[in-house]
Amino acid sequence: MIEADRLIQPQLQGQDDVVDRAMRPKLLDEYTGQDDTRAQLKVFIQAAKNRNEALDHMLIYGPPGLGKTTLAMIVANEMGVNIKSTSGPVLEKAGDLAALLTNLESGDVLFIDEIHRLSPVVEEILYPAMEDYQLDIMIGEGPAARSIKLDLPPFTLVGATTRAGALTSPLRARFGIPLRLEFYNIKDLSTIVTRSAQVMGLEIDTEGAFEIARRSRGTPRIANRLLRRVRDYAEVKHDGAITQFVADHALDLLDVDNEGFDYMDRKLMLAIIDKFMGGPVGLDNLAAAIGEERETIEDVLEPFLIQQGFIQRTPRGRIATARAYQHFQLIKPE
């Protein structure tokens, strides 16, 4: 079965959360990449501040590790308000959400990560809170139970999700500002790596930052994780400075190739090429061939390979593209 701690997985692992917090930009002007999103946010935030209003509710969605939590914190900083953070699975009962809402001050940001995992009971409480800044709660039980409304101060709900399609339509419709985060280009990732190295007090040159960036799968969280491992290699095997030579050898040692693929990515592509003549191959057959569950292939391995154009998902099954053959220096049969 697939390792839970693949070096190039975008989900949080180990000390990621602590390190990410230390390296997070605090303001939009410090934030690198996502140019369209950044430009939109600058306008929305300035308009809300000019009107002395709470910012409209915001849904941030996209693959993991791209900075959804960071953006939520930047919004609070730019608005000059407090932020309270939680996640969908934590809010099990209506009372859990009510406790958070009643402790908000005017203009505050409530950040809910994995908002697609909210229970229906909690979601029902959220609707009037988002629309009318009111909280409907039940007092008492049985025939004596009655509903009362509590007024809430204007606040901004920022929801984050990797699966926007899993949100119910009523919840999705209540977000006035939907923002999609895209994978980062190598230039922006190089800037992020350089900034993180400065925060960590590391010596790194432009080529060293580029080498780490191009193997980071378009994801800042992976870039920062690889930077920490390259630092270890540089300190033990060299003088601590990160150059292209040092980064290249460190990442080769870590089995992260020039495209950011690891053993499992290559195993999947080679199974399609060698065992199924390039495809198409059904998901169940592919899962059996590489000894993985179909959900692991769909949710963990495939997305980046498809996004980068190395495999295709068709009605008849998975196909290895010409780019996959080129990666292994093979000739795609006609």
UniProtKB/Swiss-Prot annotation:
<feature type="binding site">
    <location>
        <position position="69"/>
    </location>
    <ligand>
        <name>Mg(2+)</name>
    </ligand>
</feature>
<feature type="binding site">
    <location>
        <position position="174"/>
    </location>
    <ligand>
        <name>ATP</name>
    </ligand>
</feature>
<dbReference type="InterPro" id="IPR004605">
    <property type="entry name" value="DNA_helicase_Holl-junc_RuvB"/>
</dbReference>
<dbReference type="InterPro" id="IPR027417">
    <property type="entry name" value="P-loop_NTPase"/>
</dbReference>
<feature type="binding site">
    <location>
        <position position="68"/>
    </location>
    <ligand>
        <name>ATP</name>
    </ligand>
</feature>
<dbReference type="GO" id="GO:0000400">
    <property type="term" value="F:four-way junction DNA binding"/>
</dbReference>
<comment type="subunit">
    <text>Homohexamer. Forms an RuvA(8)-RuvB(12)-Holliday junction (HJ) complex. HJ DNA is sandwiched between 2 RuvA tetramers; dsDNA enters through RuvA and exits via RuvB. An RuvB hexamer assembles on each DNA strand where it exits the tetramer. Each RuvB hexamer is contacted by two RuvA subunits (via domain III) on 2 adjacent RuvB subunits; this complex drives branch migration. In the full resolvosome a probable DNA-RuvA(4)-RuvB(12)-RuvC(2) complex forms which resolves the HJ.</text>
</comment>
<dbReference type="GO" id="GO:0005524">
    <property type="term" value="F:ATP binding"/>
</dbReference>
<keyword id="KW-0963">Cytoplasm</keyword>
<feature type="binding site">
    <location>
        <position position="294"/>
    </location>
    <ligand>
        <name>DNA</name>
    </ligand>
</feature>
<keyword id="KW-0227">DNA damage</keyword>
<feature type="region of interest" description="Small ATPAse domain (RuvB-S)">
    <location>
        <begin position="185"/>
        <end position="255"/>
    </location>
</feature>
<dbReference type="GO" id="GO:0009378">
    <property type="term" value="F:four-way junction helicase activity"/>
</dbReference>
<dbReference type="GO" id="GO:0005737">
    <property type="term" value="C:cytoplasm"/>
</dbReference>
<dbReference type="GO" id="GO:0006310">
    <property type="term" value="P:DNA recombination"/>
</dbReference>
<keyword id="KW-0547">Nucleotide-binding</keyword>
<comment type="function">
    <text>The RuvA-RuvB-RuvC complex processes Holliday junction (HJ) DNA during genetic recombination and DNA repair, while the RuvA-RuvB complex plays an important role in the rescue of blocked DNA replication forks via replication fork reversal (RFR). RuvA specifically binds to HJ cruciform DNA, conferring on it an open structure. The RuvB hexamer acts as an ATP-dependent pump, pulling dsDNA into and through the RuvAB complex. RuvB forms 2 homohexamers on either side of HJ DNA bound by 1 or 2 RuvA tetramers; 4 subunits per hexamer contact DNA at a time.</text>
</comment>
<feature type="binding site">
    <location>
        <position position="70"/>
    </location>
    <ligand>
        <name>ATP</name>
    </ligand>
</feature>
<keyword id="KW-0233">DNA recombination</keyword>
<keyword id="KW-0067">ATP-binding</keyword>
<feature type="binding site">
    <location>
        <position position="221"/>
    </location>
    <ligand>
        <name>ATP</name>
    </ligand>
</feature>
<keyword id="KW-0378">Hydrolase</keyword>
<feature type="binding site">
    <location>
        <position position="65"/>
    </location>
    <ligand>
        <name>ATP</name>
    </ligand>
</feature>
<dbReference type="InterPro" id="IPR003593">
    <property type="entry name" value="AAA+_ATPase"/>
</dbReference>
<keyword id="KW-0234">DNA repair</keyword>
<dbReference type="GO" id="GO:0016887">
    <property type="term" value="F:ATP hydrolysis activity"/>
</dbReference>
<protein>
    <recommendedName>
        <fullName>Holliday junction branch migration complex subunit RuvB</fullName>
        <ecNumber>3.6.4.-</ecNumber>
    </recommendedName>
</protein>
<feature type="binding site">
    <location>
        <position position="318"/>
    </location>
    <ligand>
        <name>DNA</name>
    </ligand>
</feature>
<dbReference type="InterPro" id="IPR008823">
    <property type="entry name" value="RuvB_C"/>
</dbReference>
<dbReference type="GO" id="GO:0048476">
    <property type="term" value="C:Holliday junction resolvase complex"/>
</dbReference>
<dbReference type="Pfam" id="PF17864">
    <property type="entry name" value="AAA_lid_4"/>
</dbReference>
<dbReference type="InterPro" id="IPR036390">
    <property type="entry name" value="WH_DNA-bd_sf"/>
</dbReference>
<feature type="region of interest" description="Head domain (RuvB-H)">
    <location>
        <begin position="258"/>
        <end position="334"/>
    </location>
</feature>
<dbReference type="InterPro" id="IPR008824">
    <property type="entry name" value="RuvB-like_N"/>
</dbReference>
<feature type="binding site">
    <location>
        <position position="184"/>
    </location>
    <ligand>
        <name>ATP</name>
    </ligand>
</feature>
<feature type="binding site">
    <location>
        <begin position="131"/>
        <end position="133"/>
    </location>
    <ligand>
        <name>ATP</name>
    </ligand>
</feature>
<dbReference type="InterPro" id="IPR041445">
    <property type="entry name" value="AAA_lid_4"/>
</dbReference>
<comment type="similarity">
    <text>Belongs to the RuvB family.</text>
</comment>
<feature type="region of interest" description="Large ATPase domain (RuvB-L)">
    <location>
        <begin position="4"/>
        <end position="184"/>
    </location>
</feature>
<dbReference type="GO" id="GO:0006281">
    <property type="term" value="P:DNA repair"/>
</dbReference>
<dbReference type="Pfam" id="PF05491">
    <property type="entry name" value="RuvB_C"/>
</dbReference>
<dbReference type="InterPro" id="IPR036388">
    <property type="entry name" value="WH-like_DNA-bd_sf"/>
</dbReference>
